[in-house]
Amino acid sequence: MESPLGSDLARLVRIWRALIDHRLKPLELTQTHWVTLHNIHQLPPDQSQIQLAKAIGIEQPSLVRTLDQLEEKGLISRQTCASDRRAKRIKLTEKAEPLISEMEAVINKTRAEILHGISAEELEQLITLIAKLEHNIIELQAKG
């Protein structure tokens, strides 16, 4: 019998994301907000929306919706790039800085709880297998 690996992985991502959403709700944030803010925080300053979308691995229209929400919350600012008026540079606001620490604490605690009972060796094996799957998929996409 064939393993429903794709379905299993999709379900795992869905329930993991739902748990993160639930845990971030007191901060009025979602997993998508966290991923975006985390990447803005990690990347060099004044990244463009295009660079941020690539770093996160999503399409620009999806990112724009999230950035709109974060801007409404006062957590980011977007400025038109002087060298390319079509491009927007993204920066965290002062309001976002303390929130980053709170979010990271929630994420780290949740991750530790999810991985409870999994040895470092098992986790390393899982990471290696996921990397192999990703590599195979990227190669297949390149072939068309």
Swiss-Prot record:
HAMAP family: HTH_type_SlyA. The lineage of its organism: Bacteria, Pseudomonadati, Pseudomonadota, Gammaproteobacteria, Enterobacterales. Pfam families: MarR. Transcription regulator that can specifically activate or repress expression of target genes. Activates expression of genes such as molecular chaperones (groL, groS, dnaK, grpE, and cbpA), proteins involved in acid resistance (hdeA, hdeB, and gadA), the starvation lipoprotein slp, virulence protein hlyE/clyA. Represses expression of genes involved in the histidine biosynthetic pathway such as hisA, hisB, hisD, hisF and hisG. Required for the activation of virulence genes. Residues 2-135 form the HTH marR-type domain. InterPro entries: HTH_MarR-typ (IPR000835), MarR/SlyA-like (IPR039422), Tscrpt_reg_MarR-type_CS (IPR023187), Tscrpt_reg_SlyA (IPR023071), WH-like_DNA-bd_sf (IPR036388), WH_DNA-bd_sf (IPR036390). This is Transcriptional regulator SlyA. The gene is slyA. One of its GO terms (biological process) is negative regulation of DNA-templated transcription initiation. Homodimer. The keyword Metal-binding does not apply. The keyword Transcription regulation applies. SMART domains: HTH_MARR. Residues 49-72 bind DNA.
